Amino acid sequence: MDRIIEKLESGWWIVSHEQKLWLPYGELPHGLAANFDLVGQRALRIGEWQGEPVWLVLQHRRHDMGSVRQVIDQDAGLFQLAGRGVQLAEFYRSHKFCGYCGHPMHPSKTEWAMLCSHCRERYYPQIAPCIIVAIRREDSILLAQHVRHRNGVHTVLAGFVEVGETLEQAVAREVMEESGIKVKNLRYITSQPWPFPQSLMTAFMAEYDSGEIVIDPKELLEANWYRYDDLPLLPPPGTVARRLIEDTVAMCRAEYD
């Protein structure tokens, strides 16, 4: 699936190493390979954007290596491809040797996988499913400040799905563990690939059922009900959390304005 980049090769360039992304001038490189000193490097075509190929190059650059978060405010499709590139680069870096027999592995030519020629084991990129849920109580939404986000941002509750658990069970468990309340009338809304490091966010809306807020201090700094027209600092646009909050606000406005 990979090829040597030629002089006239053009497109979008995802140059990644150790979960970092090369962002000269703060943007994804776009244009001729020669303009970015990429001629002769090996590249994988991982998709297409606006009619042009998107290439992944497994390489570290001395300068301008940043986080894929820096392109989150670009088009959702381009952010998704950048996230795919970073995750694939990390997958190839972390699967050089077979976890069963210890022998070297090589990339598949037909799919995103690493193959062991010794024991025939096949490895795929790991994806960690997560739930994220907006909880509404009349004209208010439950928002929390997470321990890992000490920047004043308040967001909806989220967490990883555990082994042997349905998405619905994960929502009920995470909400109870983090906030002490029960929810009802759960509705699936959308999903979003989230490459931090390798999650798939499954987004829901739910209604408050019962209980008083009792936070898990290992997860949350605080949590509270906020009226739809008096909200704290929110996650940035482009995140599924922001969409859930905005959709909840729109529903409240339709009923209470």
From Swiss-Prot:
User: InterPro entries given for it?
Assistant: NAD-cap_RNA_hydrolase_NudC, NudC-like_C, NUDIX_hydrolase-like_dom_sf, NUDIX_hydrolase_CS, NUDIX_hydrolase_dom, RNA_Hydrolase_NudC, Znr_NADH_PPase
> A biological process (GO) annotation for this entry?
NADP catabolic process
List of residues binding a divalent metal cation 1: 158, 178, 219
Q: How is the cofactor bound?
A: Divalent metal cations. Mg(2+) or Mn(2+). Binds 1 zinc ion per subunit.
TM annotation in the entry: none
Specify which residues bind substrate according to the UniProt entry for this protein: 69, 111, 124, 192-199, 241
**Group of enzyme by EC:** hydrolase
Please list the residue ranges annotated as the Nudix hydrolase domain: 125-248
Cellular component, GO, one term: cytosol
UniProt motif (Nudix box) ranges: 159-180
What is the catalytic activity of this protein? Answer: a 5'-end NAD(+)-phospho-ribonucleoside in mRNA + H2O = a 5'-end phospho-adenosine-phospho-ribonucleoside in mRNA + beta-nicotinamide D-ribonucleotide + 2 H(+); NAD(+) + H2O = beta-nicotinamide D-ribonucleotide + AMP + 2 H(+); NADH + H2O = reduced beta-nicotinamide D-ribonucleotide + AMP + 2 H(+)
Its Enzyme Commission number(s) read: 3.6.1.-, 3.6.1.22
| Keyword terms, alphabetized | Hydrolase, Magnesium, Manganese, Metal-binding, NAD, Zinc
Q: Which GO terms describe its molecular function?
A: magnesium ion binding; manganese ion binding; NAD+ diphosphatase activity; NADH pyrophosphatase activity; RNA NAD-cap (NMN-forming) hydrolase activity; zinc ion binding
Pfam entry (one): NUDIX
Report residues binding Zn(2+): 98, 101, 116, 119
User: Which CDD domains did the record assign?
Assistant: NUDIX_NADH_pyrophosphatase_Nudt13 (cd03429)
Q: Where does a divalent metal cation 2 bind?
A: 174
PANTHER family, sorted: NAD-CAPPED RNA HYDROLASE NUDT12 (PTHR42904:SF6), NUDIX HYDROLASE, NUDC SUBFAMILY (PTHR42904)
> Per the similarity annotation, which family is this?
Belongs to the Nudix hydrolase family. NudC subfamily.
Q: Tell me the subunit arrangement.
A: Homodimer.
- Protein name per Swiss-Prot or TrEMBL: NAD-capped RNA hydrolase NudC
Source species: Salmonella agona (strain SL483)
> Mind giving the lineage of the organism this protein is from?
Bacteria, Pseudomonadati, Pseudomonadota, Gammaproteobacteria, Enterobacterales
Gene that specifies this protein = nudC
